[in-house]
Each structure stands twice: as structure tokens, then as C-alpha cells.
UniProtKB/Swiss-Prot annotation:
One of its GO terms (cellular component) is membrane. The gene is ALT8. Pfam families: p450. It comes from Alternaria alternata (Alternaria rot fungus). The keyword Heme applies. Pathway: Secondary metabolite biosynthesis. Glycans are attached at residue 127. Belongs to the cytochrome P450 family. Its cofactor is heme. This is Cytochrome P450 monooxygenase ALT8. It is an enzyme of class 1 (oxidoreductase). Gene clusters encoding host-selective toxins (HSTs) are localized on conditionally dispensable chromosomes (CDCs), also called supernumerary chromosomes, where they are present in multiple copies. The CDCs are not essential for saprophytic growth but controls host-selective pathogenicity. It is a multi-pass membrane protein.
Length: 599
């Protein structure tokens, strides 16, 4: 609204200049309107960034982060450190947060309201979920890449889309996809093993790995790989086959066009960071209009993906489509695309948006979690060895025959491998792929008993909640899978609308007693884990993502030993993290691997 007011003021200035005629000949229309525009913008920033938060905001009584706002050192951390890190440090330094809300100031002094307590989170995500929507700067930034799918839809549009798509992500259906995921994991392991042998024999061919280190002399020596790239290609193949019935072949071909296109979109750069900051200060349409190389590359990449999605939809509408390859998925009638088409609720362009959403969000987030899982395995060889022992004792050698017995695979992974499930839960807790997200109050409303004016920017920070010492005990900042093995369930009562797999737990508030390895009070609410959010806007694909991580991690650790490559930081805080859609390592993650015989 402020931007429109400034533009309107500038237009009025132009009209006034024309009306006054000769009396304003010394001043061009452009400079006159520019002066008015600049002045109005300046006044608005002074009001919104200085006067309002200091003297008029009804939120000024809340606990506020000291020295934040107006280019202060604390505020600049929000733009120079990994997302969620400053907020996490702020919260853990506070003695208490009575209202469950913490206020801080952004780069120009604008108010931000960080939701901290499980009770406040429940109010925002469940009780008043549609009163807090994604702000325009988030929607505009993501819409180009994700399309206007279920992730970005709001209100009745979101309810309708989620209702149509939910059967494709029901846990019962996801269990039927375990063999498909396992077959992709087998393909990944086989391909990696073969390429290790190729590189070990000093072949000049490098179809999978990139390395600037000396290559191994025999198969038991280490070679260096970019595991982040391999994770991304594997998850892209899984979402392709299990999600929309398409085989992309990204594992087989490292130069796969779709994979390379997504690499181009998610590639971090100083230019991308600068454009992101400008979107906070200037009209978003203006920033996207700027003739920058980054904008041009993203626009070309998005057009490529949209064209591919249209082609997939046309092929899916053909009568013979169901009888073609991957009938094991297509015959269920429950992959994302077949369900969406059968519903008749989407136009072809709306279907394109849905496919774009699940292709991008469905593979990038899980790939990020898997990359960090391998990183933590390198840092904790004891955890890696313990997990490998469980995998080898519970799952058959590769290649296996689970394609003919899907229920056995799902049952084994979900209920027969407690340490694998504990590691995966801890990965999602400790390394949420999306560490911070935003909401905006669409009207004057409340969070618990605190009045929140319309337009207030709300910060939901999974990294903060997931590592909060008041919820997780004194070892909240440590990676500790054993905390999940010490969880003692009593009579559980779930009052949230979303569910998840039995092995990973549901979502919602429940009456359970938890103890961690430090014998201190731990989380008593599912809102202490915010990786997939909760309520009507929780991640529709969380069961899919959890199964994907468990299967791929089991296969990788079962076959290979992992160590950090030379030059890869041994401290998590020293790893340069992308400030893009997900918190993945900015330059990939280079690790050393070798085959461990016997599985």
C-alpha cells in the first residue's frame, strides 16, 4: 500500500506539473515526480521504521532483541549469517519469553515478530492459520520457481487443492512407494560403486564424481565426491517416478537437462543475494524487471521447466499413458499428476503449477536434509558405524528383491530399524531444510492474548524451535539421535489435523512424557519440532520426505564409509550455507567415500 501511495503521489506530481505549465518550466516532469516519490518513500520509512515501532506499535511492550534495527550489528547478522542462526542465539540467551513472542527489528527498523512457544505456534498454525498468510515478497519470490501450486495457494483455493492432492501423500499410499524409492536407491548405490571402480583404475572418465584430489589406487581407498549433487539427482529421480510417473534419469546422467536447470535456479551468487535484499526495499515487480543476468537466467530456466511440465501433462492425457513404464505407480492411480487430472479441478496451466511445486520443493528439500545427514555422519563416525550395523543386520544385500514384497520393506524400515528412525528424526530436527519462513497478519488479530495489527510480519523459525533449550534440554545444540530412543510414550492425545508415519510420529499437541539423555525435561509438544510446520498448512509431503530420507540414507551408509574431504569445514558453523530457498551447503559438500565390503 505504501508503494502504491508513493507511485500515486508521483503521478499527481506529474499532473500538477502539466497543469501549472510555464511556472514549472525549469523543472522537468521526471525530476519533479522523482523528488515527490523519493520524499514520500522517505517519510514512509521514517514512520514505519522509526516512529511506529518506537512510539505507536502495540507490540512495543513485548520482549525485544537489544540493539536490533537500522543497520545495527545485530540486524546485519540476519543478512550475513545462515538463516535462523542469529534468531536461535537470541532466543537461547533470553531468560524467559512470557507471551511466547519476541520482537526484533529488520534492516530498516521494521518490526518482525518471532513466534517462540508451542502455544503461540499452535495459535498461528492451527487456530488462526488462515489469518496468517505468506507475505507478498515471499509469494512473488517463490511463485516464479514453484508456480502457484498448493504450497503458495491461500484460503479456499488452498483447501480445495489440498483436498484433491492429499490421497497421493497419505501414509498408506506412501508405504506402497517404498519399493520404488528403494529401486532408485539401489540404482544410486550401483552407479556410485561402479564409478568408484572406474576411478580407482585411473580411468579418465568422470561421469559421476568431481574431484581435485588424487584418486584412489584401489577400491578400498577413499575418493572424493560432491555428495550434495548426488543427493539432488537421486531425489529428483524419486519424485519423478513416484510423484508424476516420469523417469528423468538424473542418476545415470550427471548432465541431465532438468537437473542442470534446477542447479541454475538454485545456484547462489552475490547477485542473487543483492536482488533478495532489494526485494525487501523496493517494489518486487521493479526488482524482477531489472535487466540483470540473474533474472535472465532464472527466467530462461523457468520457461524450460514449464515447457517440460506441459509436455508431461499432454503425455499423461494420452489413453495409453497408464500402460507405459512405471505401471507399479501409475496403476494405483494415486501419483500426484493422475490424481490432479482425474479430479477435473485444474486447468492445464494450474497442473503445470502443481508439477513445478512438487518437482522443486519435493526434491530440493529432501536432498538438503540428506546432504546434511552425510555431513553429520562424517563428523560422528560412531553414529555412522552404529547405523551401518543396523542397516546390514535388517536389510538384505544389494541388489535385493523387495520390489516383490513392498509390505516387508515398509514394515522393516518403519518398525524394525529404531536407530535409523532416530537418526532421521534428529537430522530433520537439527537441520531443517527451510530454517526460517514468514507469515503476515491479514487482519487485526491475536496470538494468544497479544493483539497483532494487520500487516505485521510473523517469523516462523524451525531452526530456532528445533534447537530451543527450554524444549529440548541442555543438549539442544548437539546432534544426538539417542534422545529419540529415550522418548517414553504415555497416553498420547493428538489434537492437530495432520498426521504422519507411525515411525516418525504425528503432528500436533499431545500428552507425552519425554526424557533426554541428560535427564532434563524435554519437549512435551509436537510443536517443538517445526521442520514440516503443523496444522492445515503443514507440509503435505512430509511422509514422502521422511520415507525418502530413511531409504536413501540406509542405502548409502550401508554400502559406503564417509569422511570429510580435505578443505571441508569440520565445524558446522564454518560451512557456507546458501541463502536461497533451502539451507544447503553453498558450494556443495565434498566428502571422501569408499566401499565397505559385505553388503
Amino acid at each position: 500500500m505504501a508503494t502504491l501511495a508513493c507511485v500515486g503521489a508521483a503521478a499527481m506530481a506529474c499532473a500538477l506539473a502539466v497543469y501549472l505549465g510555464d511556472t514549472t518550466k525549469s523543472m522537468s516532469y521526471l525530476s519533479y515526480s522523482g523528488t515527490i516519490l523519493f520524499g514520500c518513500s522517505g517519510l514512509w520509512y521514517v514512520w514505519k521504521g522509526l516512529l511506529w515501532p518506537a512510539y505507536f506499535s502495540p507490540l512495543r511492550h513485548l520482549k525485544t532483541v537489544p540493539k536490533s534495527g537500522w543497520l545495527s550489528a545485530e540486524t546485519l547478522r540476519l543478512y550475513t549469517e545462515p538463516r535462523g542462526v542469529p534468531q536461535c542465539e537470541w532466543i537461547n540467551k533470553l531468560d524467559s519469553v512470557p507471551q511466547g513472542l519476541v520482537r526484533y527489528r529488520s534492516i530498516l527498523g521494521f518490526e518482525r515478530l518471532l513466534v517462540v512457544s508451542p502455544e503461540a505456534l499452535a495459535d498461528v498454525l492451527v487456530n488462526r492459520s488462515y489469518e496468517f498468510q505468506k507475505p507478498a515478497f515471499v509469494v512473488t519470490q517463490l511463485e516464479q520457481i514453484l508456480g502457484r501450486g498448493v504450497l503458495l495457494a491461500e484460503g479456499n483455493e488452498h483447501r480445495a487443492q489440498r483436498r484433491v492432492l492429499l490421497p497421493a501423500f497419505a501414509f498408506r499410499h506412501v508405504k506402497s512407494l517404498y519399493p520404488v524409492m528403494w529401486s532408485v536407491a539401489e540404482h544410486l548405490i550401483t552407479s556410485m560403486t561402479e564409478n568408484i571402480r572406474v576411478e580407482s583404475s585411473a580411468s579418465p572418465t568422470e561421469p559421476v564424481f568431481s574431484s581435485d584430489e588424487p584418486q584412489a589406487k584401489h577400491k578400498h581407498e577413499m575418493i572424493t565426491v560432491n555428495i550434495a549433487d548426488l543427493c539432488s539427482r537421486a531425489t529428483l529421480d524419486i519424485i519423478g517416478i513416484a510423484g508424476i510417473g516420469q523417469e528423468f534419469g538424473a542418476i545415470r546422467n550427471p548432465n541431465n537437462a532438468l537437473h542442470q536447470t534446477y542447479c541454475e535456479i538454485f545456484q547462489p551468487s552475490k547477485e542473487a543475494t543483492l536482488l533478495g535484499v532489494l526485494r525487501l526495499l523496493l517494489p518486487i515487480w521493479f526488482v524482477d524487471w531489472l535487466p540483470s543476468r540473474r533474472n535472465a537466467r532464472v527466467q530462461r530456466a523457468v520457461q524450460t521447466i514449464r515447457s517440460l511440465c506441459r509436455q508431461i501433462i499432454q503425455e499423461e492425457r494420452l489413453p495409453q499413458a497408464v500402460d507405459e513404464s512405471h505401471s507399479e505407480v501409475a496403476s494405483t492411480g494415486k501419483n500426484i499428476l493422475t490424481l490432479a487430472i482425474a479430479s477435473g479441478a485444474f486447468t492445464d496451466e494450474a497442473l503445470v503449477d502443481q508439477i513445478m511445486t512438487f518437482l522443486a520443493a519435493g526434491h530440493e528439500t529432501t536432498a538438503t536434509a540428506l546432504t546434511w545427514a552425510i555431513y553429520i555422519m562424517c563428523l560422528h563416525p560412531g553414529i555412522q558405524e552404529k547405523l551401518r550395523n543396523e542397516v546390514r543386520s535388517r536389510l538384505p544385500k544389494l541388489p535385493s528383491t523387495y520390489n516383490s514384497a513392498p509390505q516387508n520393506l515398509a514394515k522393516t524400515i518403519d518398525t524394525g530399524m529404531p536407530y535409523l528412525n532416530a537418526v532421521c528424526q534428529e537430522v530433520f530436527r537439527y537441520f531443517p531444510p527451510i530454517p526460517v519462513t514468514f507469515r503476515e497478519a491479514t487482519k487485526n488479530t491475536f496470538i494468544l492474548n497479544t493483539a497483532v495489527p494487520a500487516g505485521t510480519k510473523i517469523v516462523l523459525a524451525p531452526r530456532v524451535t528445533n534447537r530451543q533449550s527450554t524444549l529440548w534440554g541442555s543438549n539442544a545444540q548437539e546432534f544426538d539421535p539417542d534422545r529419540w530412543l529415550c522418548l517414553k510414550k504415555q497416553d498420547a492425545s493428538i489434537d492437530d489435523s495432520s498426521a504422519a508415519s507411525p515411525s516418525f510420529g504425528g503432528s500436533g499437541k499431545r500428552k507425552s512424557q519425554y526424557t533426554d539423555t541428560h535427564k532434563e525435561p524435554s519437549t512435551r509438544s509436537n510443536f517443538a519440532t517445526m521442520t514440516f510446520l503443523h496444522g492445515p498448512r503443514s507440509c503435505i509431503g512430509q511422509s514422502f520426505a521422511k520415507a525418502e530420507l530413511a531409504i536413501l540414507l540406509a542405502a548409502l551408509v550401508g554400502r559406503f564409509e564417509f569422511k570429510l574431504a580435505r578443505g571441508t569445514p569440520e565445524k558446522e558453523i564454518d560451512v557456507r550455507v546458501s541463502r536461497g530457498a533451502t539451507a544447503r551447503p553453498e558450494k556443495g559438500l565434498f566428502v571422501q567415500i569408499r566401499v565397505i565390503e559385505g553388503w
